[in-house]
A protein has these predicted regions:
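Active-site neighborhood of phospho(di)ester-bond hydrolases with catalytic His/Asp-centered motifs
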Residues: 48-50, 72-80, 100-103, 180-186, ...
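Pre-active-site segment of Zn-dependent metallo-hydrolases
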Residues: 42-82, 86-93, 107, 116-117, ...
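Active-site-proximal loop/helix segments of hydrolase catalytic cores
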Residues: 151-152, 156-225
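Flexible, acidic/histidine-containing loops and adjacent segments that form or flank the divalent-metal
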Residues: 131-159, 163, 259-274
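Binuclear metal-ion centers of metallo-dependent hydrolases, dominated by the metallo-beta-lactamase
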Residues: 98-99, 113-132, 220, 224-274
Length: 274
């Protein structure tokens, strides 16, 4: 089994990444804790996934200033829970960019007046879109979870539960063919055996914390089913319930061709096509 530790040495201000790569082939991921990733593509596009940032206890303080994220091209949200939709509506309005997520979530955001239809378009699992150019394909796939949207009504001050659509994962195929599978929140399910040969993900972003998502043992089994070149564990340690650890995931995974990169919040990792 291959493992590397990737992240940001906050005290020294040093970023640890893979060896230098030609800019046109480089893919850079910034992890902001939980399931939040900023993806810089080889063609210069910026994709933000599940931006739970300002209220995230694991996001470093310097990144809680949303302006530091820079210009974004699109936001992807895997489901309606607050630790995934997070700051997405704020960023969408601030930068005038679209949020793509479950169709039911888009409907709710529009119905409640949080976003306009232009900023919350609809799609569903199985669909593939090209919202930021023909060379980047984004496909929604199944996730085994729930997706309620919790809303505090500004008039009544009461907490309301609204439709959030079905939870999803995202297959993100970049300009150079490098493919990322962000699983969102999910349990283990049998159709993961189809995703590997169908989409051939190079990089798997996989939840391991347990309780609400896969625990390390199930996450290891999912990794064996998908067989990516690389895997980054996520969605752990943010709350006491998410007790699974990267060490447990690595132990459960055992000997494998998948290279596991354990990141720290605020850290970056750089990839090329394997």
């Amino acid at each position: 089994m291959r493992q590397r530790i990737w992240g940001l040495a906050l005290g020294l201000g040093l970023a640890f990444t893979a060896p230098a790569l030609a800019d046109q082939e480089k893919i850079e991921l910034l992890w902001l804790g939980q399931s939040a990733f900023r993806i810089n593509t080889p063609g210069g596009k910026v994709i933000l996934v599940d931006p739970f940032i300002t209220q995230n206890p694991k996001t470093p303080a310097e990144w809680k200033d949303l302006d530091k994220l820079g210009k974004l091209d699109v936001i992807l949200v895997t489901h309606a829970h607050g630790d995934h939709i997070g700051d997405a509506p704020t960023l969408a309005k601030k930068q005038n960019i679209q949020i793509w997520g479950p169709a039911g979530l888009a409907d709710t955001l529009v119905e409640l007046g949080i976003l306009t239809p232009e900023l919350a378009p609809r799609m569903a699992k199985g669909g593939t879109i090209h919202p930021i150019g023909p060379d980047i394909a984004i496909t929604q796939v199944h996730a085994e979870h729930s997706s309620e949207f919790i809303y505090v009504n500004p008039e009544t001050k009461k907490r309301e539960v609204h439709v959030g659509g079905e939870p999803v994962g995202f297959i993100i195929k970049l300009e150079n063919g490098f493919t990322i599978y962000h699983m969102g929140d999910t349990g283990l399910f049998g159709d993961l055996t189809l995703i590997g040969p169908r989409y051939r993900p190079d990089l798997l972003l996989i939840p391991i914390g347990g309780h609400f998502v896969m625990d390390p043992s199930d996450a290891a089994e999912a990794t064996r089913m998908i067989r990516p070149h690389f895997a980054i564990p996520m969605h752990y340690g943010t709350t006491p319930q998410l007790a699974g650890t990267p060490e447990q995931y690595l132990a459960a995974l055992g000997k494998t061709a998948t290279e596991v990169k354990v990141m720290q919040p605020g850290g970056t990792a750089v990839f090329d096509r394997p």
